[in-house]
Amino acid sequence: MNVIEGAIAAPNAKIAIVIARFNSFINESLLAGALDALKRQGQVSDDNITVVRCPGAYELPLVAQQVAKSDRYDAIVALGSVIRGGTPHFDYVAGECNKGLAQVALEYNTPVAFGVLTVDSIEQAIERAGTKAGNKGAEAALSALEMVNVLSQIES
């Protein structure tokens, strides 16, 4: 029986991080976690990491699509945060962001790791951006590296 599993180390991987500016006080912590994981655990050099900023989570899929279309990156890490408010806006933004990023991954055969927090409160966002609940940016970055290695093994 053959088992394909992806390692986390991917020193030659070219990674694009697309990050929303809206809720930047949360997103910058996600970015710090992602960069730390890529460099320390994934052994990816600074030269192989590109950070692309966009206005908000709703814009992440279009930016990710253009990054994937460039065919210069092995994986994309999408980072942002959508915090529930008193209107249905949260549902629209979170849903379309999720759907759009998944579509990019399938359309361009490029791993797109979902590091977008969809939370009910600012406290939950803070917990998931590096305090009680770990750093979801770091988790997304490691997921992207693992997918690069899994797909590489499948293709070889």
Curated annotation (Swiss-Prot):
GO terms for molecular function: 6,7-dimethyl-8-ribityllumazine synthase activity. It catalyses: (2S)-2-hydroxy-3-oxobutyl phosphate + 5-amino-6-(D-ribitylamino)uracil = 6,7-dimethyl-8-(1-D-ribityl)lumazine + phosphate + 2 H2O + H(+). The active site is at residue 89. Pathway: Cofactor biosynthesis; riboflavin biosynthesis; riboflavin from 2-hydroxy-3-oxobutyl phosphate and 5-amino-6-(D-ribitylamino)uracil: step 1/2. 5-amino-6-(D-ribitylamino)uracil binds at residues 22, 57-59, 81-83, 114. GO terms for cellular component: cytosol; riboflavin synthase complex. It is an enzyme of class 2 (transferase). One of its GO terms (biological process) is riboflavin biosynthetic process. Its EC number is 2.5.1.78. Pfam families: DMRL_synthase. Keywords: Riboflavin biosynthesis, Transferase. (2S)-2-hydroxy-3-oxobutyl phosphate binds at residues 86-87, 128. The keyword Transferase applies. The keyword GTP-binding does not apply. Belongs to the DMRL synthase family. Catalyzes the formation of 6,7-dimethyl-8-ribityllumazine by condensation of 5-amino-6-(D-ribitylamino)uracil with 3,4-dihydroxy-2-butanone 4-phosphate. This is the penultimate step in the biosynthesis of riboflavin. Forms an icosahedral capsid composed of 60 subunits, arranged as a dodecamer of pentamers. This is 6,7-dimethyl-8-ribityllumazine synthase. The gene is ribH.
